[in-house]
Design a protein with these regions (language model features):
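Catalytic beta/alpha-barrel core
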Residues: 6, 57-61, 81-89, 105-116, ...
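Active-site beta->alpha loop and helix N-cap motifs at the rims of alpha/beta catalytic domains
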Residues: 9-12, 19, 32-33, 38-91
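Catalytic cores of alpha/beta
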Residues: 16, 71, 115-119, 169-181
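Glycine-enriched alpha-helix->loop->beta-strand junction motifs that scaffold or abut catalytic
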Residues: 21-24, 78-81, 98-106, 122-128, ...
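Conserved, mostly hydrophobic/aromatic
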Residues: 28, 84, 120, 176
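Active-site-adjacent beta->alpha loops and helix N-cap segments on the catalytic face
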Residues: 34-43, 65-67, 86-100, 114-119, ...
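Conserved anion-binding
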Residues: 53, 94, 108-161, 168-172
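Conserved small/polar residues in nucleotide/adenosyl-binding loops
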Residues: 193-199
Length: 203
């Protein structure tokens, strides 16, 4: 059971990393670009500032598996912690299979069904990221998807870890861990409330 942070804010990562329970970071290049930050330099900085980080997800660009593999080259030499973030598409799965065969960690993202998670598992993904909050926005239960994927992986002895993403509140976090997620990646707003519950502070 691990906590990742879903942010590009180095100071926010430092503040929470000191707790000793943050094992990784997930990033979104679109949001990073909107902040005027160079994405490659950000990944390099995170790896330098937090050398013991287990996983730093770096999202690649490309419409084909070959393009994704080529784009990933600039991240692979940064650190062994770098995990290549791939889309849940046919080409993304092809790229995932390649990376698993050469020993590169992968995070297959934008997962919205157990069937998709099965494909990622068969391709050897290190992590699968079901988008809990995004599913809830469309009247589906994101935490139930987490449970379904975890059950599938357990039944079939698939080593891919469920990395619950798009978490909106602490209840999402608790239920995802309860239902079998190995990792929850928390936005900064959720990490504040998750790590500092008002009822605890008032005692």
């Amino acid at each position: 059971m691990q906590i990742f942070l879903d942010t590009a804010d180095i100071e926010a990562i430092e503040e929470r990393y000191d707790s000793g329970i943050v094992a990784g970071v997930t990033t979104n290049p679109t949001l990073v670009a909107n902040q005027g930050i160079n994405y490659l330099e950000l990944i390099q900085e995170i790896a330098e500032v937090f050398p013991e980080m287990e996983s730093i997800s770096a999202e690649v660009k490309g419409d084909t598996a070959a393009e994704m593999i080529d784009d990933a080259a600039k991240y692979r030499d940064i650190s062994e912690a770098v995990t290549i973030k791939l889309p849940m598409t046919k080409e993304g799965i092809k790229a995932c299979k390649y990376f698993s065969e050469v020993g590169v960690k992968t995070n297959v993202t934008l997962c919205f069904s157990v069937a998709q998670a099965a494909l990622a598992g068969m391709a050897g993904a290190t992590y699968i990221s079901p988008f809990v909050g995004r599913l809830n926005d469309n009247s589906f239960s994101g935490v139930e998807l987490v449970r379904g994927i975890a059950d599938l992986y357990c039944t079939q002895a698939i080593e891919t870890k469920v990395l619950a993403a798009s978490l909106r509140d602490v209840h999402h976090v608790s239920r995802c861990f309860l239902y079998g997620a190995k990792v929850c990646t928390l936005p900064i707003t959720v990490s504040y409330t998750h790590l500092t519950l008002p009822t605890t502070l008032s005692v």
